């Protein structure tokens, strides 16, 4: 039976796990690490790098290295947060039909396509590790992701060739991993502060039930923002000292980004760190170096307001849950940014208890996703997961008001209907504008899309009865329908919003991804062929030096000619796999006499111990070893 891959698709890093033998376990990538940087890079030769290889060349290739793409997933370009991301990120964010996309050398990629490349790497590495094909996945998203962001995540999975069985909230996944084996009922807070997003969710676990009581968060608050505070401080300090503004130097900013991230990590255990960036820039007087000491106290002063913001959100969620702090049994920390001492201190002060650090903050979400996959498949029995919608959903009504149909905190899946009518006499059609958010006015909420129900018979305003139904599935993805009760006419859409992709676009992107997969396979085969050819050339040269005198001059000349042909084809960067293989075959054919001479030489060297070898063979001691050497 095929395994379901549990995937934590993170802003900074991603992680994967499977459920096997009654437990979920994290799968390492092909580099042997349990987490993979969520970074995709395009080289000037058209090669696509994902993970650590992509991250390694962020500084030298900033315009073609895409990271933190989760921050613009399912987002419209005119949104304030998108404009903020544009200023911060070194690559080119462009408008694609109103939605955010990335331009690399004139080719436009949606955030879904970039994320799909990360998912494809995880899928391929898992397949190599497990020795079987993976076709199904459960992918996690921040609890505070809106409908457009959830749908975009599911589309990324489809493009990567995965059947996404479920989109699950990250804190809920963490609670599932933490609380599955707890028999006693516990009320737990999952405080999830990752690279780009923050969620706090309050759940009740026990006796195989995980029920979300309340959730809240900020989809634009995380470790990236802490890095940015350090970067801004370094830029200001450097400008004071030299008069040079590094903000316009993309390569310098990438070096600052890397240094800030490292400094942040070091300050989790050290009280002080030095940021040393030689040759950061230059002016007429010569090269400039950036050397600054950053203390933990200074770092904490830079990020304190951001950490306080998470506590304010936690307080609001606690109120929504109807619980007091005393009723909370455990506070579980999730996400790499919870390693920051100030974060742990503020959480402890607010909840009045030591946070639970028993789970690995980088891996627990993927583990929970794998458990959810096993629940869906029936490998884990009798587990009930009751999640909620993080934001209210409704439609725009007369006067630009947001009328809520499903309130935030409603357990999903859920289906609710409400009757509306026309605003004018003889109105032939109604436009249903679908919204998500908590504000009173439509314009202040997130627009998820709109559609029109036509063919309403002429009637005075207020007479027609239009039934609007909101249906949220277990993924938190919304379908909206409008039905004229008099005629039975119905219009239904799965809300994609203007940032969503059409089915045709998704299929095209799947085909593109497959085509690139084939290109990558061919590129890998070419590299392997080159390596084998290089090894053959080296071995042949070595053999010629050692036993070249044992063959005729004519044979030696043929071998040297074939060897030179192989060396020349290896020098040609544009040489194809077939061209290299032809030269390898030619050299192999003419050098069999040389191979025989080498074999005889080796046999001669071992001849002195032949008698002992015979004795060992009689006793059966080295029979297998000798056979292996001959092969």
From Swiss-Prot:
- Phosphothreonine: which positions carry it? 197
Domain of life, per UniProt, equals Bacteria
Q: Which GO terms describe its molecular function?
A: ATP binding; ATP-dependent protein folding chaperone; unfolded protein binding
Bias kind Acidic residues: ranges: 622-631
Q: Does the keyword Nucleotide-binding apply?
A: yes
Q: Which CDD domains match?
A: ASKHA_NBD_HSP70_DnaK-like
Induction and repression of expression: By stress conditions e.g. heat shock.
Keyword vocabulary terms for this entry: ATP-binding, Chaperone, Nucleotide-binding, Phosphoprotein, Stress response
Q: Where is this region: Disordered?
A: 598-631
Q: Give the record's family classification.
A: Belongs to the heat shock protein 70 family.
Q: What does this protein do?
A: Acts as a chaperone.
Q: Name the chain's protein.
A: Chaperone protein DnaK
Source organism per entry reads Nitratiruptor sp. (strain SB155-2)
Q: What is the lineage of its organism?
A: Bacteria, Pseudomonadati, Campylobacterota, Epsilonproteobacteria, Nautiliales
């Amino acid at each position: 039976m095929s395994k379901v891959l549990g995937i934590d698709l993170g802003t900074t890093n991603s992680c994967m796990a499977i459920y096997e033998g009654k437990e979920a376990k994290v799968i390492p990538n092909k580099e042997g690490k349990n987490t993979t940087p969520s970074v995709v890079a395009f080289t000037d030769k058209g090669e696509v790098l994902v993970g650590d290889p992509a991250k390694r060349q962020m500084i030298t290739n900033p315009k073609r290295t895409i990271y933190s793409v989760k921050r613009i997933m399912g987002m419209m370009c005119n949104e304030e947060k998108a404009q903020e991301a544009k200023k911060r990120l070194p690559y080119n964010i462009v408008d694609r039909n109103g939605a955010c996309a990335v331009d690399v050398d004139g080719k436009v990629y949606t955030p879904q396509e970039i994320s799909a490349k990360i998912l494809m790497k995880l899928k391929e590495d898992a397949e190599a590790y497990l020795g079987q094909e993976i076709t199904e996945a459960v992918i996690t998203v921040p609890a505070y992701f809106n409908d457009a962001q959830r749908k975009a995540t599911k589309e990324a999975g489809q493009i990567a060739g995965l059947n996404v069985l479920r989109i699950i909230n990250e804190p809920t996944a963490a609670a599932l991993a933490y609380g599955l084996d707890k028999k006693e009922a516990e009320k737990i807070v999952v405080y999830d502060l990752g690279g780009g997003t923050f969620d706090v969710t309050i759940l009740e676990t026990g006796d195989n039930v995980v029920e979300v009581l309340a959730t809240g968060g900020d989809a634009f608050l995380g470790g990236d923002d802490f890095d940015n505070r350090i970067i801004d401080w370094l830029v200001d300090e450097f400008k004071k000292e030299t008069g040079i503004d590094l903000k316009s130097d993309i390569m310098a900013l990438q070096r600052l980004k890397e240094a800030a991230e490292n400094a942040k990590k070091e300050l989790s255990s050290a009280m002080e760190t030095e940021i040393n960036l030689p040759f950061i820039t230059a002016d007429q007087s010569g090269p400039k170096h950036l050397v600054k000491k950053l203390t933990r106290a200074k770092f904490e002063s830079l990020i304190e307001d951001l950490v306080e913001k998470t506590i304010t959100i936690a307080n609001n969620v606690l109120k929504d849950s109807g619980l007091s702090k005393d009723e909370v049994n455990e506070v579980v920390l999730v996400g790499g940014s919870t390693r920051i001492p100030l974060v742990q201190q503020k959480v402890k002060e607010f909840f009045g208890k030591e946070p639970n650090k028993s789970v690995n903050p980088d891996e627990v979400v993927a583990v929970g996703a794998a458990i959810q996959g096993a629940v869906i498949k029936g490998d884990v029995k009798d587990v009930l997961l009751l999640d909620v919608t993080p934001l209210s959903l409704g439609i725009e009504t007369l006067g630009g008001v947001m009328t809520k149909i499903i309130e935030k905190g409603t357990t999903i899946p859920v289906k609710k209907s409400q009757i509306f009518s026309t605003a004018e006499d003889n109105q032939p059609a109604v436009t249903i504008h679908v919204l998500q958010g908590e504000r009173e006015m439509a314009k202040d909420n997130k627009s998820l899309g709109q559609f029109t129900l036509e063919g309403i018979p002429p009637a005075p305003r207020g007479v027609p009865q239009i039934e609007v139904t909101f249906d949220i599935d277990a993924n938190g993805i919304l379908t909206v329908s409008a039905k004229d009760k008099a005629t039975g006419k119905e219009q239904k859409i799965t809300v994609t919003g203007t940032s969503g992709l059409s089915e045709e676009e998704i299929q095209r992107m799947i085909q593109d991804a497959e085509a690139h997969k084939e290109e990558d396979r061919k590129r890998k085969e070419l590299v392997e062929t080159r390596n084998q050819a290089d090894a053959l050339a080296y071995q042949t040269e070595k053999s010629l030096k050692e036993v070249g005198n044992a063959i005729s001059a004519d044979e030696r000349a043929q071998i040297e000619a074939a060897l030179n042909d192989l060396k020349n084809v290896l020098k040609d960067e544009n040489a194809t796999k077939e061209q290299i293989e032809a030269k390898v075959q030619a050299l192999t054919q003419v050098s069999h006499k040389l191979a025989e001479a080498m074999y005889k030489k080796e046999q001669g060297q071992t001849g002195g111990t032949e008698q002992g070898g015979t004795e060992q063979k009689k006793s059966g001691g080295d029979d297998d070893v000798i056979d292996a050497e001959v092969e």
